[in-house]
Amino acid sequence: MRQPTVAGKFYPLSTKALRKEIVKCFHGLEIMSEDVIGAVVPHAGYVYSGPVAAHAFARLPKADTYVIFGPNHTGYGSPVAMSQDVWNTPFGDVETDRELGKLLAGTIIDMDEVAHRYEHSVEVQIPFLQYLFGSDFKVLPICMGMQDEDTAVEVGLEVARAVKESGKKVVFIASSDLSHYVPQEKAEKSDNYLIDAILDMDVPEIYRRKYEKDITACGYGPITAMLTAAKECGAKNTELVKYGTSGDVTGDPMVVGYAAIIVK
């Protein structure tokens, strides 16, 4: 079983406190089940990025499985790693989709728990799904240490192939923050430049803009994998539903950027 590594740090450890924190994140939002195929959500502490993430989660439909692509911040494990463990959070256990995982055997995506053991980027998304959908769903966590364009596209294509073979209803979630520790004005300018390419679903342009402006988004590979998989499964439209920064909460001059984007 994969035990939570950032409960009590990024989000509350107790069930009651966690539910209260997530309710705050959804304050003022209407929970709508739309025909969303993919999403981009941030992965900082809930007090900072939770309300932004909630804007995307509020639009997600109930699915059989949520494939969650996250960047590897720790450097541990395989370059592209899926988990097949049961994932525990303060809300309880969530099963991984082992059937979908088997369809990815022998691909660029390794089955490796080490990459996930101390990584927070996937973990922080699961309580949001539990809050909305209870325990009647599965997840397929994919941790990406390799985020180059060719790798990310291949990951997305392989996942889309497996999903089509499975016949399941699947939503793809990319976990990523945007600019890191830059002035508010620079974050907004750089992030919107990158977001425009994401909204256009233009993968080469995402990479070009990231490197042109040295934008420190940590999950550009997961975003690319999500967009690739979503497009392969019929997605044609995107929407930026919320943008914000850590400075909106802290008032600090150096901020981290967050975006909630949905793909339909």
Swiss-Prot record:
Gene3D superfamilies with a match to the protein in the record: LigB-like
UniProt superkingdom: Archaea
SUPFAM superfamilies to which the protein is assigned, alphabetical: LigB-like (SSF53213)
Cystine bridges: none
Cross-referenced Pfam families: Memo
Family: Belongs to the MEMO1 family.
Classification via NCBIfam families: AmmeMemoSam_B, PRK00782.1
Descriptive protein name: MEMO1 family protein Mbur_2394
Organism: Methanococcoides burtonii (strain DSM 6242 / NBRC 107633 / OCM 468 / ACE-M)
